[in-house]
Structures are given as C-alpha cells and as structure tokens.
C-alpha cells in the first residue's frame, strides 16, 4: 500500500505523509516475544546491566519485561520529547523529564525503547546517560526500521519496509488519529462502522481480518471513545461524522 512512496521516517506531520501510509497492528503476545528475544541477546553477549532505563512512553512495557527476564529490580525512566501523536512530532529529540540524580552513576546501563525509525531518540538518550557518569551503556529496541541512522546494540526485529507500528499500549491513541484522518480524507459526510473499516484498509492497509486477530472487537470501543472525546458525533443510528471544531 504505497510504502515505497513514504518519506524516510515517520517523524513527519500527518499532513506531510501520503494518504495511504502503511500501518501494522501488533499484539501483546508478539511484543512480549520480542522482549524475550532482546533479553536472550543481552545474556548471550554476557552483558550484565545493573539498571534498565526505559524511554517513556513506548519503552515502559519492554523495560519491565527485561527486568523480569534478566533478574533486575532497578528500573528507571527517561522521557524524550519527540512524537505528539500518530505520525506527528515536535522538533528534535530532547529530554523532557530527566532521571533522578545518581540513578545511573557507576552502573552498567541498558537503555530500551519500542522502536527506532531515525534513531534520534535513543541516540540522544545514550548521550544523556553516558554524560551522567554511568559505567558501560548499551542500547536496545524491540523493532528497528531500515531508515534508522542509529544502530542499537540489541534488536528484537529488523523491519526492511517502513510501516507505522500500532502497539497495544497506544492502540486507542493511534486509532483515534487514524480514524479521524480517513474520515477527513473520504468524500462523504457520515460513516458506518463498515465504511470506516473499509477506509482503514484502503488508506492504511489495516484489513478487517488483521484487526480482529490482533485487537478483536475493538473498533466499536474506539468509536465510543472518539464520541466521548468529542472527536465524533452521532449522525443517526449506526453512523458517525467528525465533530465540528
């Protein structure tokens, strides 16, 4: 679905992307498996970190899993300001919420994030941590896009083609953005649930089978939440339109 025409990373405003940029829906089980793969690589490499630094927000789940797999109880977080919403960003990566003083001093550190597309966030995190008198610092991502200029030490999965990954922990957030986008692009006033599904498949390659296998029965939940947030409004029984303003 037009992946080759995409810009080199997803770090663009939604308006800068083609209408048909590709998306992939993931499951908790699949991502848990990637966490295990990363932990296996760390052990095979004989690296024994003292602390895991999980980049907020995408690295939190992976950070907790890695602590479990590696037998660690020292987990801290670092917030890098980059993405605002689906396919949107706010400038270059910078530290928004720094780590507590002394949290990595003299310790071997493993930094984990969910994905690297340009690699800017995790590279900046590496620089930040090493500047705080840490011991050995290594980096890991669950997934790595071929567009990344930074190569982490450990990678759960390498993705040759660009795609926007919809993770289980931000499913609602991403789907609100995506549904709003396809409704704005389609040339009609109101939409049934089936029409919304059709446009998700047409513009983003999210077909019904993929959605229902990965996140079963969740489209109605997304639409209800969009109504609650005043993004959508009822256009009659079983139909919705984008809310004004």
Residue ranges: model-predicted function:
Residues 1-245:
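PRPP-associated nucleotide enzymes
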